Amino acid sequence: MSSQSLYKVSGNIAANALVNNDQYKTMYQESIVNPEGFWREHGKRIDWIKPYTKIKKTTFDDHNLSINWFYDGTLNASANCLDRHLAAHSDRVAIIWEGDNANEQRKITYGELHTQVCKFANALRSQGVRRGDIVTIYMPMVPEAAVAMLACARIGAVHSVVFGGFSPDSIASRVIDGKSKIVITSDEGMRGGRAIPLKRNIDDALKHPDVTSVEKVIVLKRTGGKIDWVEGRDVWWHSLVETASEHCAVEEMGAEDPLFLLYTSGSTGNPKGVLHTTGGYMVYASMTHEYVFDYKPGEIYWCTADVGWITGHSYMVYGPLANGATVLIHEGVPNHPSPARLGEMIDRHKVNILYTAPTLIRALMAEGKQHFDKYNGSSLRIMGSVGEPINPEAWRWYHEVIGHEHCPIVDTWWQTETGGILITPLPGATDTKPGSATRPFFGVQPALVDNMGNILEGATEGNLVLLDSWPGQMRTVYGDHERFVLTYFKTFRGMYFTGDGARRDEDGYYWITGRVDDVINVSGHRLGTAEVESALVSHELVAEAAVVGYPHDIKGQGIYAYVTLTRGTEESEELRQELRQWVRKEIGALATPDLIQWATGLPKTRSGKIMRRFLRKIAANEVTNLGDASTLADPAVIETLIETRLNRNE
């Protein structure tokens, strides 16, 4: 298939990159053969208060699970992001902020950010926050979100950031689980020209009968919009920092002390509080940021993720700031007020490195490349993709239209649980194939196993596992260690199970095929839904596609495709048949969709992930009990899909 095309590393990039292919091979080999020695050296990239002497105490044995890194050292994450840059770079810009409205812009130097963080850390202390307390942060994409995180880290409090698009119920469940005393929010946020009622959502969440721990709500004035006020509980951010000292000594934290909680929704049941600790996480986030993006001092780096996701934590706050980078933070969405916004911002801020998601790339692709006619893009050097496998068609569009065919693309695979990037190309070292995450980062040992846990060699397909620990790995599910062991280490003994399927090609490159529950078994043959989706999207009239299995009398499972057409394309039975033939030609008869439903929109979370469990239920005609839809960007999409579903029981 065309996805096998190879994009070679240019000589110019290889010559100037931090790591070329020979260096990658040498360093990778050392990291696997001698992890103690490798990480002893690379752990020094951050500042330690008490240097570590013990590097690694890890085992994936589910009866005796242990994940410890640099575990006798002490440090502070906030000091690593701020204080250590002050002597040489206090005037360097740390954050460039652009509001939802492009007329609103701010620049904050490392010196200024340090002052703001110290003042807010003292403000938190004045409200009774102590080391080990969990602080819930529900903020828009403004610099103060990073200030709040770093202030917590400075005084040893554990932050739990909740994405600003989540509903009151979602907020409540996270506050209850973490027993937060303090919630930090904003009157409103701005996104795509609309005001988002953050404070109102917090008020509603805190009315939940099981929320009993919250004592104070700190409110940032962002829009000046009208809000309700609870005397004695609510306090303005600005009134607290006005009187706070700008000197705040850092709390000395053990490497294995918690840095943050980040909740991920399990496919069922309560959200999982993924717990990351301080030392290993800071080493891994900063190292992956530098090497994966080939970051050079002074470059402008833009990660479009929201601070409420792990990508925002690792690659907008902790990784880049630990490296002294200049980070662009954007409050709104990069395709508002028009699809040209992304290109305008790259040009306006002379962005050198862009890290974004396939869902945005596909959305821009559907609008057409004419929106980039005025885009210059000459500042751009490296481009990344994160969040889900990127289909080859979108990869090539990204490469041609945004990267003008001269920027390497790093298609990164990792998870909330992994803390940082695990499988990725390196710009100066890895020839890329559209759709492949390519090779493991240093210290990462992926393997493919069959359903019995037997390791598969060579070019093959199977369940993606990791054989040994890496410093950025999560340590537990907050308050439920048994769930942690059960979810990740019981399925395949002695291995971390990612929940993803993958194939490895003859070059040793990894291709993520999607969640293992996104595999369709058609007449005894396993088909990754991502593969069928890629084939559909490679048709010029298809903007987006989501594929699920549904019960089929003859095949066991049939293939059900939800297809969004490009703007202006008419739905027709002829086009439906054309798409079925197209997939047949691209993959084979086995992959031909049985049912194709036209979909004006797909059920997505606000980070752009397609919620396939809804699609599976609709395809199976199980439409009475779909479960919680509160995390969807547009819950109305579900109603439309139910009304137009094809698999009704007549």
Swiss-Prot record:
Protein name per its UniProtKB record: Acetyl-coenzyme A synthetase
PTM comment text: Acetylated. Deacetylation by the SIR2-homolog deacetylase activates the enzyme.
Keyword hit for Glycoprotein: no
Organism lineage string: Bacteria, Pseudomonadati, Pseudomonadota, Gammaproteobacteria, Alteromonadales
Amino-acid positions noted as binding Mg(2+) in the UniProt annotation, renumbered to this chain: V537, H539, V542
Cytoplasm found in the keyword field: no
NCBIfam families: Ac_CoA_lig_AcsA (TIGR02188), PRK00174.1 (NF001208)
Name of the gene encoding the protein in the UniProt record: acsA
EC class (word): ligase
Domain of life: Bacteria
PTM annotation (N6-acetyllysine): residues: K609
GO terms for MF: acetate-CoA ligase activity; AMP binding; ATP binding; metal ion binding
Catalytic activity: acetate + ATP + CoA = acetyl-CoA + AMP + diphosphate
UniProt record similarity statement: Belongs to the ATP-dependent AMP-binding enzyme family.
Binding-site residues, ATP: G387, E388, P389, D411, T412, W413, W414, Q415, T416, D500, R515, R526
Function: Catalyzes the conversion of acetate into acetyl-CoA (AcCoA), an essential intermediate at the junction of anabolic and catabolic pathways. AcsA undergoes a two-step reaction. In the first half reaction, AcsA combines acetate with ATP to form acetyl-adenylate (AcAMP) intermediate. In the second half reaction, it can then transfer the acetyl group from AcAMP to the sulfhydryl group of CoA, forming the product AcCoA.
Binding residue positions for CoA: R191, G192, G193, R194, T311, N335, S523, R584
